[in-house]
């Protein structure tokens, strides 16, 4: 029987907690090396990493093709002028933006950002610019991030929201079956309130891997058009090919106005 964490990891985690704010760490794993889907901690214990929910996680560790590209880029003068993508133009950003557009909805533009929560924050700001400072709509059990604005529309764990003020939000049920009696709840909200946007995941990640019913998402798109409200799909955890298509909305026969 292997004791996890081992002695080195236990010691480091204890020392770590003395000097850092323990906010998102949930498991006492101290990674030393990794290759493909295997990682090894500082005690020499090997783990299989099944995480694939965000960012580049599905690519695993130390993918040889990626390492070669990074090595080539960092060892040449190509990387010398890339201070920050938001300050200067560069070919690499143009190329990746073009590739993203080739697999996304038509007539849209790309805005690069640092994290999922920051993407949601800016999606909200874009909607506010169009509609004004009105309430937004999000679904119960959705997760959109822990920054203050995104947190207002994160409804997966109440503990995350304790002691923080909220932006105005209207909550609706996330329906997973077409026969749900509350599948038209959004229509009642839009009849009563003028809103700035509708924000939802299609497959809820942190909320429990709940898959939205096809009718639910199609109704949201229909009502967003009918009431002229921007529809934001949060694809941070479901996008980039994780469902067999580039974006999960493709399975539903609809497109968002804004996507993160």
Predicted regions and their residues:
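PLP-dependent aspartate aminotransferase-fold enzymes
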Residues: 95-197
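Conserved active-site segment immediately N-terminal to the catalytic lysine
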Residues: 248-260
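Catalytic PLP-binding core of fold-type I/II PLP enzymes
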Residues: 210-244
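Active-site and channel-lining beta-strand-loop segments
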Residues: 28-51
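Glycine-rich loop-to-alpha-helix module at the N-terminal edge of alpha/beta enzyme cores
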Residues: 4-6, 18-20, 46-133
């Amino acid at each position: 029987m292997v004791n996890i964490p081992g002695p080195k990891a236990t010691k480091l985690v204890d020392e770590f907690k003395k000097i850092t704010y323990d906010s998102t760490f949930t498991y006492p794993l101290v990674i030393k090396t990794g290759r493909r889907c295997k990682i090894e901690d500082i005690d020499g214990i090997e783990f299989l990493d099944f995480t694939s929910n965000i960012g580049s996680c599905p690519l695993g560790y130390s993918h040889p093709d990626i390492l070669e590209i990074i090595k080539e880029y960092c060892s040449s003068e190509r990387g010398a002028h890339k201070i920050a993508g938001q300050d200067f133009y560069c070919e690499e950003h143009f190329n990746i933006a073009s590739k993203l557009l080739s697999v996304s909805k038509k007539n849209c533009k790309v805005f690069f950002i640092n994290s999922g929560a920051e993407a949601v924050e800016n999606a909200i700001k874009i909607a506010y610019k169009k509609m004004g400072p009105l309430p937004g709509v999000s679904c119960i059990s959705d997760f959109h991030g822990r920054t203050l604005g995104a947190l207002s529309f994160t409804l997966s764990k109440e503990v995350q929201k304790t002691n923080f003020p909220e932006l105005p939000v209207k909550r609706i049920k996330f329906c997973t079956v077409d026969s749900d009696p509350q599948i038209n709840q959004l229509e009642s909200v839009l009849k009563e309130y003028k809103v700035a946007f509708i924000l939802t995941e299609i497959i809820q990640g942190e909320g429990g891997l709940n898959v939205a019913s096809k009718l639910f998402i199609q109704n949201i798109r229909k009502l967003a058009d009918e009431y002229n409200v921007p529809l934001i799909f949060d694809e941070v955890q479901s996008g980039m090919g994780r469902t067999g298509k580039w974006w999960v909305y493709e399975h539903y026969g609809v497109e968002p106005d804004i996507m993160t």
